[in-house]
UniProtKB/Swiss-Prot annotation:
This is UV-stimulated scaffold protein A. Residues 285-294, 400-412 have a biased composition (Acidic residues). Factor involved in transcription-coupled nucleotide excision repair (TC-NER), a mechanism that rapidly removes RNA polymerase II-blocking lesions from the transcribed strand of active genes. Acts as a key adapter that promotes recruitment of factors involved in TC-NER. Facilitates the ubiquitination of the elongating form of RNA polymerase II (RNA pol IIo) at DNA damage sites, thereby promoting RNA pol IIo backtracking and access by the TC-NER machinery to lesion sites. Residues 599-618 have a biased composition (Basic and acidic residues). Monoubiquitinated at Lys-416 in response to transcription stress; this promotes efficient transfer of TFIIH to stalled RNA polymerase II.
Amino acid sequence: MDQKLSQLIEELTTSGESQLNAQKMKELKKICKSSEEQLSHAYRLLITQLTQGHAEIRLSAFQIVDELFTRSHQFRMLLVSDFQEFLELTLGTDSDRPLPPPREAAQRLRQAAMQAVEGWNEKFGQAYKKLALGYHFLKHTKKVDFRDINVRTVAERKREEEKQKHLDKIHRESADRAKREMEEMYDEIECCLTEVENCFKLLVPLDFVPCPEDKFFGEASSMTEGYAPCPLSPDLATPRESGLSGPQDEEQPCCSKDLVASAYHVGSVVGLKALPQTAMKDSSRDEDEPSDPDDFLRSHGLGSHKYTLDVEVPSDGLKVQENEDNLAVLHAARDSLKLIQNKFLPTVCSWVQRFTRAGTYSAHLKQAIDLKMELELALKKYEELNIEPGRGQRSRTEALEDSEDEDQDFVEVPEKEGYEPRIPDHLRAEYGLEPKAPLKTLEKGTAVCKLQERTRMRREEEASDPTSAAAQMLRLQDCLSSPSPSSTRVLPGPEEAQKQAERARAPIVPFGVDLCYWGQEQLTAGKILKSDSQHRFWKPSEVEEEVDSAHVSEMLHSRHITFSGTFEPVQHKCRALRPNGRLCERQDRLKCPFHGKIIPRDDKGQPLNPEDRAREQRQQLQRQQAHPDWQDPEFLKDVEAATGVDLGSSRSSKKGKGKKKKHPNLTDLRERTNTARARLEKKVFAKAAVQRVVAAMNQMDQKKHEKFANQFNYALK
């Protein structure tokens, strides 16, 4: 019975579910009702589970305690006797013993415990004095607010208040810095906006908007379209309306009455403010000069009144063509807009965010928002201009200027009189020159001369080096030839002739430091000689007179030979069949470290040569003979199913043993969250990375010791 009770409590508390299993909970209650000993044993097991370092285990154990507390007087007596410890384990009233992770489960445990303690006090507070005292202790001493949804303790509230004060202080300081930056940069931003507006006025010198509030170019076209059908004032009327009659007044169409306005609007867009001034000028001119219908038609380029004029305003907005006239203005506007987009607008947006977080800089916030709207409006205006780049004008101008500069660099020199750069073959005898040799003979003779010249120069260079074999041979020849100049020459024997031929074929190796110290075990070079310190006080206790330098010693014993051949990349692959059914993709030159010598194989990984196929079959048979039949995984599974004993069949097919989780349903506390800090720590504090850093630092220290070995600071170490 005790084993069954322990198993039930273990399964219920380690399930990791928010609600308890009703069937298992029913069995647990039935066991607890059987005797008081079983109830006491269940209480001890639950207290043990409440001390576990996992909030989900404590939450499930508390739910069991709540179920048993409301049903058993004996269980209430046991719990009230250890009520303080119970509160510390469920509510975290002791700041030195906070609730364990995970945080969400700990928060749910605290809320459930708070509601349960309040309900227990209302129902059983009068009967159990310790329960009422515990509730009073929580409410008045620990200052626990039972109406608080988050169920925070005094220490937690204090920590959150301090954290909020710290954040408010940071936001205030950030807003103060933004205020100072705004005061410093406001004039610069306004100057930049003024430059952009002036550039726009130079590019489009017409007033598009009737009121200063509307600043978008898109509204200009709509206003112009709306203005086109409006009737003109009497001062701008046609001669017929002014009282001048003609023979063609009856045939004049209605649109001819607006010829002045139509001609004024052809090919451009005119603002509404300019119309009254134009009308006043025209009326004053009409008063001074007599009006004539023919003069009116001729002045406006019209032949007669028999046709109509339709003025179409493009609906797609403006289009500014880039040319040589507005190139400088466009460059200035682009520079200012680039400064706005890359510097001013992000800075102003950051000001708005800082002032919003602080919440106390309403005036500065409004000013920053207005400034942001002006900057965005300037960028939108530039987009609505639809600037079309010039078609090759700039490139042609620059190319022309570059060609002129290049032509100025050359100085014209007159040709030399009588100079012939090439003498014909039939005139070479006339100039006293030898006839030109054939091309093949000339090339062959030139190649032979060059080869002889290189051989002679190489011999002279070798003879000039006293350490070379050629110089030694030359010295020996001088010594042998000087005592007997008149002696007859002795023919060399066959062995000497063979040696001379081998010497002639032997390659010439340049003399290096390794040949100088070849075969010597005790090298004098590569050692640092330390002199004894003559100071009275700064003197090391033990001085090594000679210190070997590993770097220099390695140079004296080794030689770097450059590979003179050509590198041929590996084109073939191993293509051996892997256990997962795929082919090996390693591109080793001769031997694969996993599958041995690389041999030609087909698409299925089988060897193409019969000898290789037979050899692999023999190796496979040897491996099968070395592995006993009773260790076959399928056979072991059948035996396990028959006997019920674990023979390790599940581990036989795997490389590693693996560790099974004890409670897989619980949240793994050792699993770290995938944050940026965790990923950086994994890379920075990796074993290989730490070893590389240590090796680099040791190498730096060794170099300092070798370089400053005579200084007392390094001599004492």
